[in-house]
UniProtKB/Swiss-Prot annotation:
Any one of the GO CC terms: small ribosomal subunit
Alphabetized InterPro entries for the sequence: NA-bd_OB-fold, Ribosomal_uS12, Ribosomal_uS12_bac
Swiss-Prot/TrEMBL GO biological process terms: translation
Described purpose of this protein according to its UniProt entry: With S4 and S5 plays an important role in translational accuracy. Interacts with and stabilizes bases of the 16S rRNA that are involved in tRNA selection in the A site and with the mRNA backbone. Located at the interface of the 30S and 50S subunits, it traverses the body of the 30S subunit contacting proteins on the other side and probably holding the rRNA structure together. The combined cluster of proteins S8, S12 and S17 appears to hold together the shoulder and platform of the 30S subunit.
GO molecular function: rRNA binding; structural constituent of ribosome; tRNA binding
Family per similarity comment: Belongs to the universal ribosomal protein uS12 family.
Species of the source: Citrifermentans bemidjiense (strain ATCC BAA-1014 / DSM 16622 / JCM 12645 / Bem)
Swiss-Prot/TrEMBL keywords: Methylation, Ribonucleoprotein, Ribosomal protein, RNA-binding, rRNA-binding, tRNA-binding
Short name of any one Pfam family annotated for the protein: Ribosom_S12_S23
Gene behind this protein: rpsL
Superkingdom: Bacteria
Quaternary organization: Part of the 30S ribosomal subunit. Contacts proteins S8 and S17. May interact with IF1 in the 30S initiation complex.
UniProt-recorded name of the protein: Small ribosomal subunit protein uS12
Keyword Protein biosynthesis in record: no
Length: 123
């Protein structure tokens, strides 16, 4: 434990914030290439087959990201844009794929919350 004098001379060092999406390296989104597209099951009280993709980012980091919405066209070598945002019932999934950009098409037939799923306005 430091003495009062040592604290006066040096002070305490603040810890700093921990990033929730470290692979983005302070960028709002990052581009990447899908290395594997698969389904996985969620944690205990929930049951489903959640669609996820393993993505190698332009900075070389490989992350697991969630594919939101109903149905998708992603496969290996698809180029996608990822953003931060975890999926609470999938351990290790801390990123979301942005729908309607690059190789990922928007959700077909989506009427509500369209901007979140890259769906165009219906005519």
């Amino acid at each position: 434990m430091p003495t009062i004098n040592q604290l006066i001379r040096h002070g305490r060092e603040s810890k700093g914030d921990k990033s929730t999406a470290p692979a983005l390296r302070s960028c709002p989104q990052k581009r990447g290439v899908c290395t594997r597209v698969y389904t996985t099951t969620p944690k205990k009280p929930n049951s489903a087959l959640r669609k996820v993709a393993r993505v190698r980012l332009t900075n070389g980091v490989e992350v697991t990201s969630y594919i939101p919405g109903v149905g998708h066209n992603l496969q290996e070598h698809s180029v996608v844009l990822i953003r931060g945002g975890r999926v609470k019932d999938l351990p290790g999934v801390r990123y979301h794929i942005v729908r309607g950009t690059l190789d990922s098409v928007g959700v077909k037939g989506r009427m509500k919350s369209r901007s979140k799923y890259g769906a165009k306005r219906p005519k």
